[in-house]
């Protein structure tokens, strides 16, 4: 809802031409509440024709996201890994958001994968992957299996989405996946995400939900990363301090996943193997990661989550990926978020968020905040990186 401002006082503009926009907007909001109708009202909802057109333009991604959530099915495969209990996913809030979920066994997926052996589409999928990877095609021997898996997932989506228009996938990737399928699914996850079917790792249901929202709002490919590790002092001193704004070392961290970030969001990419798994398994069953440093530029780190007791909670933070080499492995980048250290302690830890965060490329916090508010996240449960001097409720004033 927006209202037309008074345009002029000339020629009786405030006599016969007065629109009384302030009064009208108040009455509109009153009647919306009476009827329990949700509506988006801009921060300052009164303006000229041009300003109101801009407000409508800002509303478009919000409206798209709300529509998309009401037409989304999440398809999951397998339970969370026992030794990594970190992404609890009460499903009640999914239905409150208008989202449907279909939970499947890994065994169902494995059966379908085996039935796709020799599928006539596999060579075409391999050719696509070879073209995308280019010189980064370091594991050509695994491409046929990856193409078979990709076709399996795409066919599953078509067969199971029902009346729903959109699909996101929460996939399993360990501990039994690699030994039974013979590869890791990271690269396929990245490719489907780039096609508009976000795929999360480790059966992270609210992770793929967050990715989906980011995809719709930004109209671009997103990724899902671990808020993973600190930046070593030597990298900070050599490549960041005094060169990239006023970031302290506590404002920086590394966002990492094994290899699920799309090639379009990497500065360079190579097909490799999952190094962590390969410490205990043969390398050949861990092939399938897409590795490289994430492209530098503005980002929004965010997540929508149902807590273990089924309350909706979210966080949003603007930041950037710095143009600094990571010297590490996986799909990884050096992130900088103003006041990240405090945000990490008093939003992420205090709010009991899991380690996965969705990353949208660009600054989309304004739209995401409105989406979260519209779909029912209490405003006091939407965390953000508060500037220096603005204390979090749990922050020790004497620290």
Regions found by a protein language model. Name each.
Residues 6-125, 132-135:
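Cap/lid and interdomain-hinge subdomains that line or gate substrate/regulatory clefts
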Residues 276-399:
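Extended hydrophobic packing segments that form well-structured cores
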Residues 1-5, 169:
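Short beta-strand elements of ligand-binding domains
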Residues 193-329:
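C-terminal catalytic subdomain
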Residues 6-55, 62, 178-233:
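Anion-binding alpha/beta catalytic cores of soluble intermediary-metabolism enzymes, centered on
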Residues 168-175, 226-242, 387-393:
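A glycine-rich phosphate-binding loop feature that marks nucleotide/adenosyl-phosphate handling sites
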Residues 89-96, 184-189, 374-377:
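Short, solvent-exposed amphipathic alpha-helical segments in soluble enzyme
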Residues 122-217:
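Long, internal scaffold/assembly segments composed of regular secondary structure
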């Amino acid at each position: 809802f927006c209202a037309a401002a008074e345009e002029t006082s000339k020629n009786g503009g405030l006599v016969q031409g007065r629109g009384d926009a302030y009064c009208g907007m108040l009455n509109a909001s009153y009647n919306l509440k009476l009827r329990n109708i949700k509506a988006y009202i801009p921060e300052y909802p009164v303006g000229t024709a041009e300003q109101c057109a801009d407000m409508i333009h800002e509303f478009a991604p919000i409206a798209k996201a709300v529509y998309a959530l009401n037409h989304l099915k999440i398809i999951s495969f397998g339970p969370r890994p026992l030794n990594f209990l970190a992404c609890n996913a009460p499903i009640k809030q999914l239905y409150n958001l208008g989202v449907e979920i279909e939970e499947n066994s890994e065994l169902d997926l494995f059966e379908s994968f085996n039935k796709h052996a020799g599928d006539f589409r596999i060579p075409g999928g391999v050719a696509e992957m070879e073209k995308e990877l280019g010189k980064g095609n370091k594991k050509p021997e695994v491409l046929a299996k990856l193409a078979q898996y990709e076709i399996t997932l795409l066919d599953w989506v078509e067969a199971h989405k029902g009346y729903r228009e959109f699909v996101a996938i929460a996939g399993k990737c360990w501990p039994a996946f690699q030994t039974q399928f013979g590869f890791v699914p990271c690269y396929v996850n990245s490719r489907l995400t780039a096609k508009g079917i976000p795929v999360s790792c480790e059966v992270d249901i609210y992770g793929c939900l967050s990715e989906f929202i980011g995809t719709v709002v930004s109209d671009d490919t997103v990724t899902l990363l671990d808020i993973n590790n600190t930046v070593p002092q030597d990298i900070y001193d050599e490549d960041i301090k005094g060169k990239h704004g006023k970031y302290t070392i506590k404002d920086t961290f590394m966002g990492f996943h094994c290899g699920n970030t799309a090639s379009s969001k990497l500065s360079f990419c190579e097909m490799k193997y999952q190094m962590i798994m390969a410490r205990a398994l043969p390398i050949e069953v861990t092939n399938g990661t897409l590795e490289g440093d994430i492209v530098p530029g503005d980002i929004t780190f965010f997540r929508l989550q149902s807590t273990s007791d089924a309350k909706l909670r979210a966080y949003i933070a603007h930041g950037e990926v710095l143009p600094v080499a990571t010297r590490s492995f996986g799909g990884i980048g050096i992130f900088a978020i103003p006041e990240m250290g405090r945000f990490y302690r008093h939003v992420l830890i205090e709010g009991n968020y899991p380690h996965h965060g969705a990353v949208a490329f660009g600054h989309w916090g304004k739209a995401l905040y409105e989406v979260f508010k519209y779909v029912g996240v209490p405003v006091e449960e939407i965390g953000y990186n508060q500037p220096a001097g603005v204390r979090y409720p749990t922050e020790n004033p004497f620290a």
